[in-house]
Amino acid sequence: MENRRIIRDMHCVSNKLSRQLDNLFSTQGITHMQFAILSFITRSTNDGKDVFQKNLEISFDIRPSSVSSILSLMEEKKLIKRVSVKNDARLRKIILTKEGSKKYDDVHAKVVMFENKIKSLFSDDEIKVFFNVLDKLYDYTEE
């Protein structure tokens, strides 16, 4: 094998994929993180769970002030609403608006198409090997 560097190559591919995804999101008028939050709220709501700011802070490992800023922008874009909870006035449940739900559906369809294009480059066996390698790298980085 030639003088290839795993970390450098992973970093380059990651940057290129991130740029392509960022372009996809920007053409839809949202950021990658806003889409991730729309996705989280959609999945949680479908599972019958309420979503609060603290859930987002923990799930995405980001600071409360950052989450608050992102949510404020999403409220301005009418993608979400924060509503008070009856039994605790301090808590504000985060819900998708109709616009937010439509935006999620539209962007999610484009993300699925993007992922399917990538998957089409590989055989089923190559995809299995790829995920095995990713799992090992993920486990290694958790040590």
Labelled PLM ranges:
Residues 1-28:
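N-terminal leader segment of winged-helix/HTH proteins
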Residues 1, 48, 125-143:
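C-terminal regulatory/oligomerization modules of transcriptional regulators
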Residues 21-63:
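N-terminal helix-turn-helix DNA-binding core of bacterial DNA-binding proteins
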Residues 23, 73, 136:
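Alpha-helical DNA-recognition elements
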Residues 72-132:
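Charged, amphipathic alpha-helical coiled-coil/dimerization segments
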